[in-house]
Amino acid sequence: MDIGTINFNYQSRAVYSAHPQTSRGRLFHEKMNTARTPFQRDRDRIIHSNAFRRLKHKTQVFIADESDHYRTRLTHSIEVSQIARTLARALYLDEDLTEAIALVHDFGHTPFGHAGEEALNEAMMQYGGFDHNAQALRIVTKLEQRYANFDGLNLTWETLEGLVKHNGPLLGPYAKNKEVPSDILQYNAKQDLALDCFAGLEAQCAAIADDIAYNAHDIDDGLRSQFLTLDQFEHVPLTAAILKEITDEHPQLDQARCGYTLVRRQITTMIEDVLKQSHENLARIKPTSINDIYQAKQTIVTFSPSMTVYEKELKNFLFENLYYHEQILSRRNAAKCIVQKLFNCYYENPDTMPESWCQKAVHLKNQELARLIADFLSGMSDHYALREYHRLFDHTNHFV
């Protein structure tokens, strides 16, 4: 079959979207596939990876063994990809690339959510620190070892640059004041990811979809856990307006269904706001190619100014009432202790790691050993980290 006969135009694309036929390719050259575009192959490689499966037992706020219904990194990533594809379709972007970036964006996260990352970053501080985006890049370019001709997944340039820069440029005048992790700089020396430019719109869709999903679904989990009540949301401008609509339409609706309806309508409201604002941004900038997106002096897929305020107020509310809840903080502290003690144990006694990792640790010292341990630790699920802690230290459930 002639590769030229593949229908790469199965969906309408804007002139400023990514296109598989003009992809900048992969670090290691591969023949084109006769059935799938390069971005479809990226998505499929991500889904079939070990790192993707491990997301099933990694959490964000609630620990994985607390309930079967709280969200994990896996369910969150799927929900982000669904929202991101909705945005991409409405903006005439490449949906497969958008989905790939959305599905891979959490690969580098540690067990126990942000508490685990804070603990690992503190343990790694004298060895270069730990950053989940840099770790995700390590995973897809080095640590996943499934192919005969290369380490990593050998993803396209567009997926990698979207992974690394979905929150904005890392270098140059529009970068946030944050040191670029060495792993990103080292890879960038091999394959230039244009770290001083904005990411493509597909990555921007994945980034804002992450925000939309995170806020809405933490409300859902907060209500499910009973750490939050619907009454509290009557004092948050965005949710108060939605709740009023719901109660006006369904005055007898029970609390559970009201909560689910709140979450659904909040997602819809935010998506509609992003699309309206993004269309306005595009109309003003008038990009004629994807390079105009890379060289833009701003993020294009954004909330409106008013929604930005509402979203910040909602985040503040969640921090004060959920993330800083006494029981959540207690579990965060326990999680940090587990990660810190595991790191120290492995660093002082590398032979306590599983055999395959012990072999890698032979002759490694200082920063190289610490980075190996960070690779091992960050790849753990919540369940595996707890098992390791119990094996090495005690049999107490520290989250009871």
UniProtKB/Swiss-Prot annotation:
SUPFAM superfamilies, sorted: HD-domain/PDEase-like
Span of the signal peptide: none
Domain HD residues, every copy: 73-215
Cited Gene3D superfamilies: Hypothetical protein af1432
Keywords tagged on the record: Hydrolase
GO molecular function annotations of the record: dGTPase activity
UniProt record similarity statement: Belongs to the dGTPase family. Type 2 subfamily.
Protein's name in the database: Deoxyguanosinetriphosphate triphosphohydrolase-like protein
